[in-house]
Amino acid sequence: MPKRRDILAIVLIVLPWTLLVTVWHQSTIAPLLTTHKGEPLTDSRREAAPGADPREYCMSDRDIVEVVRTEYVYTRPPPWSDTLPTIHVVTPTYSRPVQKAELTRMANTLLHVPNLHWLVVEDAPRRTPLTARLLRDTGLNYTHLHVETPRNYKLRGDARDPRIPRGTMQRNLALRWLRETFPRNSSQPGVVYFADDDNTYSLELFEEMRSTRRVSVWPVAFVGGLRYEAPRVNGAGKVVGWKTVFDPHRPFAIDMAGFAVNLRLILQRSQAYFKLRGVKGGYQESSLLRELVTLNDLEPKAANCTKILVWHTRTEKPVLVNEGKKGFTDPTVEI
């Protein structure tokens, strides 16, 4: 009996202390568990058990959201709309090492524009196979023309007389094609835009110009030795001048990429062409626009000419010194 009483006494003494320690331990840990449960678990707080499958660890982590993969199928070019005006993009081009690269990049932009017709005019005695294949493969609606700039307007090789801006005859041929294709009193809604193959174009630009009533205008970046040139617009939303350093008193001190013309205006003013002779540098745009509109007729786009949507970029001329006179690489491989 004495031994049993000793054991009972020990149990009665130890048991309360055991219960007390257990309760205290749980009350200390519980707040920590509650806090961690509501917080994202970082790698420093939670690590996979040694030898555990990493995939199982990721699957059990509630903070990792499973990505649902969806396949998108696009139609390029977009389906033709019977309600949208057609944008006729006139692009002069000429043979050079980067020609295919320039046209490919531009085509990849135009493929996203609905109701677009690409008028590509080569400075060549005939249509070249390179350009013909490229246009055919794009899937775009296009017309392929050619006219060679006369030799007397060329200095030597690829250089040109600065009095004859590159692309003048090619743009004029495109204007003639439009007038021969559409009747003068055509009700066909459309816009004509002169887009060189080395520029960079925002898709937003094409939607801005689509509503052109007569002639719309906007800024162009990297021209005239400035970050950008732009029409000067007053508080009433009218063009009153030009933000440019080079000859700001020109009738239309604007870059070729900075305006679009309503197709009906092109058809009605059949005398309006880019002047080939007697035009100073920088006046090529004015030679056409002064036959179409006055300053007061211009429609500022791109948030009243405060947004840049086109950049006058230039591709760096490739260095091909290792080709040698005979050519190191296979000349039959098209680049």
Swiss-Prot record:
Transmembrane segments: 7-27
Chain positions covered by the region annotation Interaction with galactose moiety of substrate glycoprotein: 246-255
PTM comment: The soluble form derives from the membrane form by proteolytic processing.
Glycosylation sites: N141, N185, N304
Annotated InterPro entries: Glyco_trans_43, Nucleotide-diphossugar_trans
Residue positions binding UDP-alpha-D-glucuronate: P92, T93, Y94, D123, R166, R171, D196, D197, D198, H312, T313, R314
Keyword list, A-Z: Glycoprotein, Golgi apparatus, Manganese, Membrane, Metal-binding, Phosphoprotein, Secreted, Signal-anchor, Transferase, Transmembrane, Transmembrane helix
GO cellular component: endoplasmic reticulum membrane; extracellular region; Golgi membrane
Quaternary data: Homodimer. Interacts with SAR1A.
Name of the molecule in the record: Galactosylgalactosylxylosylprotein 3-beta-glucuronosyltransferase 1
Naturally occurring in which organism (per UniProt): Canis lupus familiaris (Dog)
